[in-house]
């Protein structure tokens, strides 16, 4: 049972949400009085309550989603809130649906989407993973953060070939190393206000670290938003190469570290928007003609379930007509299908851009 102080904070938060008429978050949409009353006293075995789930969305009324999972059990215990939000965000992943088993498919189906190098500046594919036996950020102790970092360090240190590299803990990082990682756009900063409010940044920078290979095409973030973010990237449009590198890395890491997986929801992550495959395949792409015709851009993006963001990711503008375009769907389809959909969409956008020139 949640304690009285928590429940009174929850009542306050619920009232604030109800009163916020211009709040458009999925939290507000699905946290009805019935659902609220059903869940407000519940507590996971690690001690997480509904407050941990909703506090970021209560504090930041401009959130798109507004909920985070404090631990794996939260997805089950607070399902009356999570399930409809997941269904809404993941476009029809119904509460009776089951996410398919992991399937990276035939990695040779992926190509260089821009062999002439005219449009695509860089290509990146990432996935998130949570380590089994540990809660997500809000419930982690400092000792757990450090223990996880040590496990990740020893796992990554044994990688060989193209994936071989170095691990840099954020704690006690030398200024010159820090600057170098910032210049390479590798260093992650302490979480934004959405993550801060979700208590995702406690004991910072304890237990946080960055690994990258010698070519700087493979990167692992340890304990940023998720326990692990595994990233493969390079300049240009060779999606095939980027995808193959990611798949071999994930397979290698998985041999040594068991990941949290849910029968229905797939791989578990802190934010419900990343569940399932957890895969985000993206390009930084110059589309000057389509940039001037935003409606057409959005129409094609919609057809292939692509998400169009500004150059520096979420909540940013496109600088010089350069967009960050990625697959939007992560659930109810395989890893292969998610990336294939993105490849098809990017090829189509490039074709249209060429026709408009």
Curated annotation (Swiss-Prot):
It comes from the Eukaryota. It catalyses: L-arginine + ATP = N(omega)-phospho-L-arginine + ADP + H(+). GO terms for biological process: phosphocreatine biosynthetic process. GO terms for cellular component: extracellular space. Residues 9-91 form the Phosphagen kinase N-terminal domain. PROSITE patterns: PHOSPHAGEN_KINASE, PHOSPHAGEN_KINASE_C, PHOSPHAGEN_KINASE_N. This is Arginine kinase. It holds the Pfam family ATP-gua_Ptrans. Its EC number is 2.7.3.3.
């Amino acid at each position: 049972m949640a304690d009285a102080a928590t429940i009174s904070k929850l009542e306050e938060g619920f009232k604030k949400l109800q009163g916020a008429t211009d709040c458009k978050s999925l939290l507000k949409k699905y946290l009805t009085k019935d659902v609220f009353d059903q869940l407000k006293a519940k507590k996971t075995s690690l001690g997480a309550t509904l407050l941990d789930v909703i506090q970021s969305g209560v504090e930041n009324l401009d959130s798109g989603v507004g909920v985070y999972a404090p631990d794996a059990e939260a997805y089950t215990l607070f399902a009356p809130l999570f399930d409809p939000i997941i269904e809404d965000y993941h476009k029809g992943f119904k509460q009776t649906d089951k996410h398919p088993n992991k399937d990276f498919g035939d990695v040779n189906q992926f190509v260089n989407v821009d062999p002439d190098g005219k449009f695509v500046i860089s290509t990146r594919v990432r996935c998130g993973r949570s380590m089994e036996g540990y809660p997500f950020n809000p419930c982690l102790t400092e000792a757990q953060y450090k223990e996880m970092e040590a496990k990740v360090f020893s796992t990554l240190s044994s990688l060989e070939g193209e994936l071989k590299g170095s691990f840099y803990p954020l704690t006690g990082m030398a200024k010159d190393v820090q600057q170098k990682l910032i210049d390479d756009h590798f260093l992650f900063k302490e979480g934004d206000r959405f993550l801060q409010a979700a208590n995702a940044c406690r004991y910072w920078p304890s237990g946080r670290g960055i690994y990258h290979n010698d070519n700087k095409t493979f990167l692992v973030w340890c304990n940023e938003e998720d326990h692990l973010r595994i990233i493969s990237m390079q300049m240009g449009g060779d999606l095939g190469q980027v995808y193959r590198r990611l798949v071999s890395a994930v397979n290698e890491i998985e041999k040594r570290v068991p990941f949290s997986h849910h029968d229905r929801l797939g791989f578990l992550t802190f934010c419900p928007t990343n569940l399932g495959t957890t895969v985000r395949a993206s390009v930084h792409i110059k589309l000057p003609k389509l940039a001037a015709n935003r409606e057409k851009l959005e129409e094609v993006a919609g057809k292939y379930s692509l998400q169009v963001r500004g150059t520096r990711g979420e909540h940013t503008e496109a600088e010089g007509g350069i967009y960050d375009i990625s697959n939007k769907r992560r659930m109810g389809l395989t890893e292969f299908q998610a990336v294939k959909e993105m490849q098809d969409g990017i090829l189509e956008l490039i074709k249209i851009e060429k026709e408009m020139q």
